[in-house]
Amino acid sequence: MSEALSVPAAEGENTVTASESPDLAATSARAEKVGKQEKPEKAEKQSPMMLQYHRIKADHPDTLLFYRMGDFYELFHDDAEKAARLLDITLTARGQSGGVPIRMAGIPFHSADQYLARLVKLGESVAICEQIGDPATSKGPVERKVVRIVTPGTLTDAALLPDKSDTFLLAVHQQTTRRGVSKTGLAWLNLASGELRLMECDAAQLSRELERIRPAEVLYTDGMDLPTLTCARTRLPEWHFDQEAGTRRLREQIGVASLEPFGCSGLGAALGAAGALLNYAATTQGQSLRHVQGVTVERESEFVGLDSATRRNLELTETLRGTESPTLFSLLDTCATTMGSRALRHWLHHPLRDPALPRARQQAIGALITQGPDGLRAVLRKLADVERITARLALLSARPRDLSSLRDTLRALPDVQAATVSSEDAPLLAQTLEEIDIPQDCLELLIRAVADEPSTVIRDGGVIARGYDSELDELRDISENCGQFLIDLETRERERTGITNLRVEYNRVHGFYIEVTNGQADKVPDDYRRRQTLKNAERYITPELKAFEDKALSAQDRALAREKQLYDGLLQALLPHIGSLRRVAGALARLDVLATLAERAKTLDWVQPERVQENVIDISQGRHPVVEGQLAAESVAFIANDCQLNEARKLLLITGPNMGGKSTFMRQTALIVLLACVGAWVPARRAVIGPVDRIFTRIGAADDLAGGRSTFMVEMTEAAAILHNATPSSLVLMDEIGRGTSTFDGLALAWAIARHLLSHNRSHTLFATHYFELTQLPVEFPQAANVHLSAVEHGDGIVFLHAVQDGPASQSYGLQVAQLAGVPQPVIRAARKHLAWLEEQSADATPTPQMDLFSAQSSPSADDEDDKSAGQSAVPPAQAATLEALADIDPDSLSPREALEALYRLKSISETARTV
């Protein structure tokens, strides 16, 4: 029975009904008048279908509801208005209900993914409501239910996910222990891979951890204040985060009696967060999370600490301008697979303190360089994204081409093994190859079951291979042999009737028919029954053709139904292989990253760093990898530099001109240290790196308008974080600290901060400054040393040598840099004149008291300075005014009109002088 949709009629109109069949979905069903989203006072005015809609929508009030009607997803009322605005689709209003216009909008089912992707990117969540009943047998509305909820943190479809970055759903919960200590528990899940991680930290560290993990969606409790986030946020009741329930839920998910082997002992708030996370994820997917088969507990002491400022300033995966290139990741990412690209991104954001694993990675890279990584990388390029396909298998949402891609990838694994030689000197490489263990049963099943080139979706058929199921083969034979039957029937009927132009054909609307032109109508036999009349012909059906039609069309429908049944069974049969497929995916991703880093090291002339226990950073001929790459594109050589930091040389005071390369030198040192801790080779001739626990950067600054903080406040906040947290094993980069306030305040702060870093933190520090007074610091602290970026003057210009040399710089060359930047010549000349006056005042005048940091202070006006200059000069005032006016004139840049105006000004000055 077809499903009818009826609505209250607007005044003066009749109630409209329409069949909700796929054939009418794009016409009648899309134009139906529907009731208000709020449940109407008089339920009898609503159709059964709209009552069904309101009931389902009531369970999902905060999400957009995609309500399946034939070949469309419909949105009604407020959802329709919101979707129309966000997606730029048509919003219709047809009729009224209770005086309110009835709004609706829709999107085609076959293109839903692109609309979902746009909504998720905007932070919206969408409930997908599908028809699960059969319209042909339903009495009343077709049965529907929400089969999944798409949220920013629970994406698994390939069309919705970024290829080269992970999407995390994170739950955070704060808990106070019996001793009154507040702990913050984090649990985050990559639903597209099944990777689950837990961590506990102090509340003060929450912002840093969120910056590291960068979740797409955060679950949190009522009343909890979250740091400023750009991701989606979902508030859940407190009881969702119950620790005991969370522990139970996690044990059930992993299938173990105890969580101790996973390192969960002592965790509290994180277990509550894990319970909320798993329940939320399972609810959105509408089923269990079979691919989440383990948990990893992270400790703060495991990774080299990188706060948000450091990640931003080092431009690991995003530039300061917010673009993806040029960054360290964009330079390194030549990965053959998207799995490898995601793993590489993770490695760069998670450098390790313990040198054991980085050293093992570097050994594997060395072995691959010796073997030559090109052959392996060529094989890896043929592989599919096994990690995400496995997740979709576990969620029973894999599509036919996922299965064919998985089959082809498993077939190629022997080639991967053959292209890589295990080495005793590279145990990690040997371990990785062992983990690429081909699941033969899984491969054989896929070979038998899946067609060589299956259709995109199961409803189109052609997915299950021939020979896999005899019943399906028989049904296919019936429907596929129609052509030959029609040819044979047409031949027989022409001979029987004598109608030479008789045709036997088929179309979707009228089925099978025999067509006879009007001129041959007198020859039509009595057993022909008219099916359709055309202008110049008649179409007929015979008992034989009708019997075949029933059989053929029935066979096609039954074949599609059988194929869907077999496909569902195939997905179930593949579930036991989820664990082995996840291990293979992890090993392939790791191998791809190692091969990529080997190729990069070989191509870019990088070296394997030496990791030692001594607290030292000793880099010979180090280079900034990204800047070097940019210069190479312009055929310009990068100037390499050395950097030595040790117990006797803890702080380098770096002076030199703007644009001389101070910031580049500092950043390249940090990047070399980070790459060594990641396990990559490094851009240097030689690098010896000791223990590193954190990397801090205080480089550049900008107003925090949203937070109400000035540039100087941002600068001091970051400096305070460094002074409170840096240790002797930390690397600190300080660039022009104190520049955001008055000269003496800034100098005093810079001096005190440098002294504190030397005397208290004792960190490895690169301290760039334009305060030349700081170059006297090594007199008080022998652990400090002066270096400078050299430059030479050439005429009125300057040539930057970009070479780091011992000792302080002689000057900053600020005016020369301003000239290079295109500052007008009159301004440059005025600046030179004023600089000379300032230097004279500095040498001769008594010092003026320095005002307090927050006090207003004024500097002499230009007029005052000119008066002072004139007063100290023997030149008469009138002559001085003439000379100054002449100095401001650039004859080569004047137009004729400007030259004439300048001449009039000089004449005016002369006349004024005579009058005086």
UniProtKB/Swiss-Prot annotation:
Which Pfam families does UniProt cross-reference here? MutS_I (PF01624), MutS_II (PF05188), MutS_III (PF05192), MutS_IV (PF05190), MutS_V (PF00488)
UniProt GO molecular function: ATP binding; ATP-dependent DNA damage sensor activity; damaged DNA binding; mismatched DNA binding
> What segments bear the compositional bias annotation Polar residues?
843-861
Q: List the disulfide bonds.
A: none
Residue sites binding ATP per the record: 656-663
Annotated Basic and acidic residues bias = 30-45
The entry's keywords: ATP-binding, DNA damage, DNA repair, DNA-binding, Nucleotide-binding
One of the record's GO cellular component terms: cytosol
List the residue ranges forming a coiled coil, or say none: none
Q: Enumerate the Gene Ontology biological process terms.
A: mismatch repair
**SUPFAM superfamilies, per this entry?**
DNA repair protein MutS, domain I, DNA repair protein MutS, domain II, DNA repair protein MutS, domain III, P-loop containing nucleoside triphosphate hydrolases
List every stretch annotated Disordered: 1-47, 843-880
Q: Cross-referenced InterPro entries, in alphabetical order?
A: DNA_mismatch_repair_MutS (IPR005748), DNA_mismatch_repair_MutS-lik_N (IPR007695), DNA_mismatch_repair_MutS/MSH (IPR017261), DNA_mismatch_repair_MutS_C (IPR000432), DNA_mismatch_repair_MutS_clamp (IPR007861), DNA_mismatch_repair_MutS_core (IPR007696), DNA_mismatch_repair_MutS_N (IPR016151), DNA_mismatch_repair_MutS_sf (IPR036187)
Annotated transmembrane regions: none
As for what it does, the entry says: This protein is involved in the repair of mismatches in DNA. It is possible that it carries out the mismatch recognition step. This protein has a weak ATPase activity.
Q: Which family does it belong to?
A: Belongs to the DNA mismatch repair MutS family.
Entry protein name: DNA mismatch repair protein MutS
Species in which this protein is naturally found: Cupriavidus metallidurans (strain ATCC 43123 / DSM 2839 / NBRC 102507 / CH34)
